[in-house]
Amino acid sequence: MPNLSFRIDSIRAERYSFEAIQQLNINMNIMFGKPEKRENSFLVGFVIKIDCTPPMASIDIKGLVIITPISQDEYTKLGEEFKKGSVPYPLIIAVYSYNLPIITLLSRELGIPPPIQLPMQSSQHEKGINYHL
């Protein structure tokens, strides 16, 4: 179970309009950069973008997750997973869970409901690596 450390590099939250809106759709995207190997760990950049329709507010969070495997076997498995070009689902959930309090606070300050839906997992469920925060 690898250890995860997070670094938030940038937070931007902006409200464009204060008009009353009957229906508000909130879209959230989590995007990951290409993993970098550093000594015995991996560095993976991420960007979380939250936008509203109609456009009345937006939130952007940029950061980095540092994944430190406990064993050489975990390091090898993670390296293979990243070579496939996919981000492990437990890592997506860990990034979302870490940033959810920040997103909730910013949403409250902007006066919009927080996007609390968990990211969807692909239909294939593979046995993988569990992560520890």
Say what each PLM segment does.
Residues 1-94, 104, 108-133:
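N-terminal intrinsically disordered, cationic/polar leader segments
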